[in-house]
Amino acid sequence: MILENFKRESLIPLPVTFISTTSKDGIRNIAPYSCVMPVLRPFDLICVASAKMRDTVVNIKDTGEFVINMPGVEMVDKVIPTASHVPFDVNEFELADLKERPSKKVKAPGIEGCYAWMECKLHNIYEDEYEGFPYLLILGKVVHLEVNDDIYNPEDGSWDIEKANPLMMVESDRGMHFCTVSDINKFEPYGAMFPDGKDPLAWMYEKRETRE
């Protein structure tokens, strides 16, 4: 079946994240974002694609900070309230009945009830326009990363996907279909991709762990 080119997003399962920011006047904002991806490995950069006219974008430009919050499926009912178009001076934590979680390295608070939090400083913004529609790619540098203890194994860096139950989404002509992921019990080391069986980036992980 041949599809229209723009429907490529319908075939890619996307994470659902909540990005929390604070305006320069201290107003709290939350918005759901799915076009979010880490930039390679083991960098500490993360990329967010956004329409230009968003309160989140204004706050990130003004303050240079934001938090990417990772919710489980139990928070699916918070997506629409935080996506609603409301006046700039509305506190969306109160609107969505969400509790603030104090951040360690940025002023913007995280969101209680999520399973992971990425506190970010603005690294760069790339602005462009496509067919008359302005958009941005926001690059953030993760300055503090935290995850619930009960889902993460510090011994090998793995995490319990089924316990975290990450909220995800696929799109269709009618709207958003929310879903999650499951473990298929298959594992391969990074080195399996290379002829000598060694991960050429292993030294970078060791260097970072030593530095931290």
UniProtKB/Swiss-Prot annotation:
Signal peptide: none annotated. SUPFAM superfamilies: FMN-binding split barrel (SSF50475). GO terms for molecular function: FMN binding. InterPro entries: Flavin_Rdtase-like_dom (IPR002563), Split_barrel_FMN-bd (IPR012349). SMART domains: Flavin_Reduct. The keyword Flavoprotein applies. Its cofactor is FMN. Keywords: Flavoprotein, FMN. The keyword Flavoprotein applies. Belongs to the flavoredoxin family. This is Uncharacterized protein MTH_574. The lineage of its organism: Archaea, Methanobacteriati, Methanobacteriota, Methanomada group, Methanobacteria.
